[in-house]
Amino acid sequence: MAFRATDRVVPVSVNRIEIEAEVPFETLRRAFEAEVPPLDEERFRQLVANGAEWRAFQQAAGGNSIHSFVTFWRNYPSAIMKVGGADIPSASYLIGDYATAARMFRHDAGVMLYAPLRLELHANRSGGTVLTVDQPSSQLTSLQNNKITQTGYELDRMLGDLLEELGLPRPAALRR
């Protein structure tokens, strides 16, 4: 079966933020996972099943901290990568909150390519940890919608708040 379709290529320039922290990988990983808890998926399933109003979703959407992020997904590739010859501790996450994503989604569902945010941690050779994340606003401006771009700047601020809660410096790119 073939479908009629058109395509376009949208060049995107993204700022990747890398923070090298003088803290062991496991210490930062545990702190991150305590600060950005897993999404309570069962609670959201119940809200949908019960026909809850949007206000109930908003109240359940964010975490309990200043940044309001929760973890939607996480992956620990280290064991498999070790078999492949690279013994480097690593963890990847998708983080965000539904309330912020919904404000962008109503303008362009394509925001889901960038929300939730992808964040990665890995050990470096000096015994520290590298935290890597793409700057949200630099991704979201590619959708060419001012409301989405403004929310991207808000996500920059929230990401900076998270980094500070972890005891890391707020990068200049996240100081708007």
Describe these PLM feature segments.
Residues 1-176:
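Feature detects long, helix-prone N-terminal segments enriched in hydrophobes
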